[in-house]
Amino acid sequence: MRGRTRVSLALAGALVAAAACATGAVQGEAVWLMTEGEAALAPAPATRAPLPNDGPVITIITPQQGAEVTSPFPVEIQFEPRPGGALPKMDTLKLTALKIFEIDITDRVKPYVGESKLFVKEAKIPTGRHRLKLTIEDAAGKQTGQILEVTVR
């Protein structure tokens, strides 16, 4: 019986940890969003193609657009239904670093995605000017995209 109790307790602990990750409750250490090598890549060429804007409303709370920050810094982004629109599907959130090619960094922030927001208490990005692209869909399949520009000193 003791073996079963230990397994049950270990399983319960794993489930609690998984639930914490799923709700964005993991906020222990600073999280590297980009490596030094990725940050050193040439920036993506400027594009005039508009991003989709039919899905959820993306509100970047911090850092402010074009801000100069010191690493680590908080990242807080809210996702809400567009008026008359469907709820955001947080599992469709995608975050990419816009370099000479797009670098998908979504998996690095997944533990910090909650029901309607992304919150990273201490995000780390190497020094430089960086552009990050966020995209998300709503339950109706409509998508919104937004670019966040930040300079890390």
Model-predicted segments: where are they?
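Solvent-exposed loop/turn segments flanking beta-strands in beta-repeat/beta-sandwich domains
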Residues: R82-L95
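Aromatic sugar-binding surface patches on proteins
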Residues: P111-F119
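Short beta-strand edge segments in extracellular beta-sheet folds
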Residues: E149-R153
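Short, compositionally biased P/S/T/A/G/V-rich stretches that sit at domain boundaries
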Residues: G24-P74, E80
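Surface-exposed, short loops/turns at beta-strand junctions within beta-sandwich domains
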Residues: E122-R129
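Extracellular and select intracellular beta-sandwich modules with Ser/Thr-enriched
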Residues: Q143-I147
